[in-house]
Regions:
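N-terminal chloroplast transit peptides
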Residues: 1-22
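Long amphipathic alpha-helical repeat/alpha-solenoid cores
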Residues: 27-169
């Protein structure tokens, strides 16, 4: 029951209205050697960071529920998201579909992603699933692992519908 509730909450969060806030185009210049990686990081910061947001404490890199995060928190968490999913474009797609992912604790995101990889047939399938519904990265890893057999199919159908009906796509 708890696993189904986690999945439903993740889906509901994805349909929450988008809040448009004043955002600076790029709050800092990235020094990554790969220009594509630097562009992805700058895009994530421009999309997710809020100028003037309080800096997160070192042990608590996450967004509050209002969705505000400083540029350094977004940058650090986004780089760790790239390492988790293994692809800068996929990571950018994830934060584009749910900006809050850029502020969630990276170890929690990794544990949840790994749980979805374990439940899906392939890593690519899990990546496609969480790219379409990034709220699934907020599910407790234990709930993902212990969910009933049909829950992955349900999650895929919901993610597909969310992707189909995504506003501004």
């Amino acid at each position: 029951m708890q696993a189904h509730l986690s999945l439903l909450l993740a889906c509901a969060a994805a349909f929450a209205p988008v809040q448009h806030m004043n955002r600076s185009p790029a709050l800092f210049a990235e020094t990554a050697e790969d220009p594509a990686l630097a562009a992805a990081i700058d895009a994530a910061v421009a999309l997710c960071a809020k100028e003037g947001a309080p800096a997160a404490a070192e042990g608590d890199r996450r967004l509050d529920f209002a969705g505000t995060a400083d540029a350094e928190t977004v940058r650090t968490n986004f780089v760790e998201l790239i390492e988790t999913v293994g692809d800068a474009d996929a990571a950018l797609r994830i934060v584009t579909n749910n900006k809050m992912v850029a502020g969630w604790k990276p170890d929690r995101v990794k544990a949840s992603f790994d749980a979805w990889v374990e439940r899906c047939e392939t890593r690519e399938e899990a990546l496609d699933l969480v790219s379409k519904n990034p709220g699934l990265l907020f599910c407790k890893p234990a709930d993902v692992k212990d969910s009933p057999a049909g829950s992955v199919l349900q999650a895929k159908m919901i993610a597909g519908a969310m992707d189909f009906f995504r506003f501004g796509k």
